[in-house]
């Protein structure tokens, strides 16, 4: 059987000389892995993580790992390797997809979101965009957080916390007596302001980390590569603050 699709290479593991197992996040079929061979200098450039490729997967049976062939559509790596924030953000989002999506599980809408994020990241690193990506990933996995109104009073004013149980915003008035049991809600997520303080960045990363760890990673740790990104962003801002 054959599968043709467009996708982003998210993993590449050596199998033997010039042969690798690649994993591609495809637009219409989710994650697919296959054996790919680098037969020339050109193909070595094609099979890089983050490359957008025309993907052909061939196997006798669907359950087989199959043979993968790719043609390059777009490469981002040149934009990322010259900037640590871009590179670490890129590595983090790829590692999260690799960990959370299951092989051959369809995620139709998320592919275009990933491409849009990578296009924007190639131009400029934006922390707000990164957090929005993590929030979208949580929503894709069934854990959409709601910042639109207080989950108790329905007010849209003075939202200050997030309930760790419901994933819904809580107003300052309602939440103040229970603030030790609630998550602080970063103001930039409500205002859209890209002038984000170090404390707001810490709050935002703690917020998404909480839901990743509680509902998705459970007893195993989040990807180490994401932690590298988190530490870099917070340490970099602490030094320049």
Swiss-Prot record:
Q: Which InterPro entries match?
A: ARFGAP/RecO (IPR037278), DNA_rep/recomb_RecO_N (IPR022572), NA-bd_OB-fold (IPR012340), RecO (IPR003717), RecO_C (IPR042242)
Gene designation per UniProt: recO
The answer on whether this UniProt entry bears the keyword Cytoplasm reads no
Question: What is the official name of this protein in its record?
Answer: DNA repair protein RecO
- GO BP terms in the entry: DNA recombination; double-strand break repair
Q: What does this protein do?
A: Involved in DNA repair and RecF pathway recombination.
The record ties this protein, via PANTHER family, to: DNA REPAIR PROTEIN RECO
Protein family membership: Belongs to the RecO family.
Record's keyword terms, sorted: DNA damage, DNA recombination, DNA repair
Has keyword DNA damage?
yes
